[in-house]
């Protein structure tokens, strides 16, 4: 990361601290990640603003605050293996891969997946497994997972995902249509405890449609 980007990423991490993010490893990962590499060059000047930005195909790179917030919630269960639904630009995966030993990520849009793989390889992040497929179904053959993060809003919590959690595992997912709620769902045996975190806005999680 060049000096200007490094300074900008550090300033972004500081602004997230001021916004309420307190997990030091998360803030360090944000400070170490060049967000402009996950955007088209035309949007590079906005890379370190705390806002969501378009990445093509009707998708977005999430607001840095939400990336950090979802990550610190997920890390509360100290996961060893994590599944991400919605690779998108790869930015969220870049943050997670610095914080967990093993990351699996699923993307339904082939062009986005190819770009994300290239970006993450250039950042020397090699603890990531990629799948082109339907995020609603997760990635059963790689499971179970200690934690699952969904980066698009589902109309309801997908049973296929909760079933891929370990006992004590956590699903972090935005749920809803016009009004969306970020949920933390914890598996306790064959039961699931849901906790509402905050109001959010995400692109929809598409069921069964690849692009």
Swiss-Prot record:
It is found in: Cytoplasm. The keyword Lipid biosynthesis does not apply. Pfam families: PCMT (PF01135). Catalyzes the methyl esterification of L-isoaspartyl residues in peptides and proteins that result from spontaneous decomposition of normal L-aspartyl and L-asparaginyl residues. It plays a role in the repair and/or degradation of damaged proteins. It catalyses: [protein]-L-isoaspartate + S-adenosyl-L-methionine = [protein]-L-isoaspartate alpha-methyl ester + S-adenosyl-L-homocysteine. This is Protein-L-isoaspartate O-methyltransferase. The gene is pcm. PROSITE patterns: PCMT (PS01279). It comes from the Bacteria.
């Amino acid at each position: 990361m060049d000096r200007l980007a490094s300074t900008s990423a550090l300033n972004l991490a500081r602004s997230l601290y001021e916004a309420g993010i307190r997990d030091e490893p998360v803030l360090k990962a944000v400070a170490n990640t060049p967000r402009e590499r996950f955007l088209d060059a035309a949007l590079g000047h906005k890379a370190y603003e705390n806002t969501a930005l378009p990445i093509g195909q009707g998708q977005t790179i999430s607001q840095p605050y939400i990336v950090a917030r979802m990550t610190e919630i997920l890390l509360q269960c100290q996961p060893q293996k994590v599944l991400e639904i919605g690779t998108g630009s790869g930015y969220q995966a870049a943050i997670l891969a610095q914080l967990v030993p093993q990351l699996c990520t699923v993307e339904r849009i082939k062009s986005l997946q190819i770009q994300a793989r290239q970006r993450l390889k250039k950042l020397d992040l090699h603890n990531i497994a990629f799948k082109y497929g339907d995020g609603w179904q997760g990635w059963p053959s790689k499971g179970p997972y200690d934690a699952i993060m969904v980066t698009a809003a589902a109309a309801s919590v997908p049973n296929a995902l909760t079933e891929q959690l370990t006992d004590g595992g956590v699903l972090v997912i935005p749920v809803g249509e016009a009004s969306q709620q970020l949920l933390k769902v914890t598996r306790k045996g064959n039961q699931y405890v849901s906790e509402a975190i905050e109001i959010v806005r995400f692109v929809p999680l598409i069921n069964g449609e690849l692009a």
